[in-house]
């Protein structure tokens, strides 16, 4: 997460090569920062800096490859295992898909529905970013891409809050947004209490949270981050919130 924040910091300082290096390292360390390439590309496009965008992407790819290629060549099975797991896994803890299944709402062909939904949401985000009155800083919009990645995924791991919160903090524009921020954090606390009580049932404990309660806590968590994200996006759309033309 530190390397991701450094990539965002240097990008907004217009130190694109340094940012590209850190983003490449970030993607190599944990794959999720790859979703930042969408808002980055939109910012370059809106700023008419297409050549800089290609250079940025090349820099990030070089440093990603410098870390990944040697490992892939020497320990391919271990390197590929992460990608294989995410391709083959079904609906898992924390995801909206798992919550719906607990509520007896079955989603057929999840391996098709999940990527299609993700594509639709990312296309929607791209349209939103292109229609903003002014071009925002990366710090203001990085969270949006990560929220799509985490909430639409087949798993919503507990550690995702460690990824989302720093990006949420740097995206805050005014004190009024703190209301929805703390509401979201309250739903996260509720979820983290709920999942351990739900997992207790798997160990034949005499206490625990029923599946329906855990499903509601899961959906409440997604609702919390969605409301916060909506507030940020709404405020950013106001003409007076632009960063640059």
Annotated model-derived regions:
Residues 1-81, 110-245:
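Multi-pass membrane glycosyltransferase architecture that uses lipid-linked
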Residues 81-106, 217-218:
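Luminal/periplasmic active-site loops of membrane-embedded glycosylation enzymes
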């Amino acid at each position: 997460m530190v390397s991701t924040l450094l990539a965002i910091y240097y990008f907004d300082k217009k130190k694109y090569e340094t940012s590209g290096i850190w983003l490449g390292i970030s993607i190599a360390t944990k794959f999720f920062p790859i979703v930042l390439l969408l808002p980055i590309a939109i910012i370059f496009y809106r700023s008419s800096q297409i050549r800089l965008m290609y250079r940025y992407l090349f820099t990030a790819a070089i440093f990603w490859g410098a870390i990944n290629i040697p490992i892939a060549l020497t320990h391919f099975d271990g390197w590929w295992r992460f990608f294989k797991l995410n391709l083959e896994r079904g609906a898992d803890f924390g995801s909206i898909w798992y919550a719906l299944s607990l509520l007896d709402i079955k989603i057929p062909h999840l391996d098709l529905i999940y990527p299609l939904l993700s594509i639709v949401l990312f296309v929607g985000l791209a349209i939103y970013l292109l229609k903003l009155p002014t071009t925002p800083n990366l710090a203001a919009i990085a969270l949006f891409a990560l929220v799509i990645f985490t909430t639409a995924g087949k798993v919503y791991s507990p550690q995702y809050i460690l990824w989302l919160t720093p990006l949420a903090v740097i995206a805050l524009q005014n004190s009024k947004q703190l209301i929805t921020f703390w509401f979201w954090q309250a739903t996260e606390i509720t979820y983290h209490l709920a999942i351990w009580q739900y997992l207790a049932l798997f160990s034949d404990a005499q206490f625990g949270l029923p599946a329906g309660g855990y499903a509601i806590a899961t959906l409440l968590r997604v609702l919390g981050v969605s409301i916060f994200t909506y507030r940020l996006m709404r405020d950013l759309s106001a003409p007076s919130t632009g960063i640059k033309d």
